[in-house]
Amino acid sequence: MYTFDSRVRYSETDENGNLSLESLIDYMQDCTNFQSEDLGVGLEYHRQKNIMWVLNFWQIVIDEYPAMGENITVGTQAFGFEKMFGHRNFLITHQGEPEHRIAIANSLWVLMDLKKGRPMIVTPEIGDVYGIHEPLPMDYASRKIKVPKDGGKECDQFLVQE
């Protein structure tokens, strides 16, 4: 698993002085980017190849929100590539205490060909550099959301895009 250590900054906290959800997700995304950069397949590589990974699905389980100033370790690992998809886990723990979990996540990414504007197959050149690891132990949810049989409940409408 690729990891980096950090300290929760004031600018990353919510009104209670704890790491915000947005910042927790930012740590996960940064971890992936740091790994890609360290492996030589970072932003410049992606620009040259006209490719981009796009997040398709997140499943994040948060056990706690660390407080400002706490030291944390953020980790990520790929656990599979199939067709256009990349499966990736994330783990955030208290620094030096790998058994003290803060959050764990499952994610699914789609590799996009930016010239064609559509998904592309993950080639060995792209996938092999990350290696394949065992999925982290967690309850994996389906990425498909079931519609309730009773049709759910009607809520206020809101404009998504004009």
Indicate residue ranges for each PLM-predicted region.
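A sequence-composition feature that detects small, non-aromatic residues
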Residues: 67, 78, 103-105, 141
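Acidic, low-complexity central loop/insert segments
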Residues: 96-103
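Hot-dog-fold acyl-thioester-processing enzymes
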Residues: 1-55, 106, 111-162
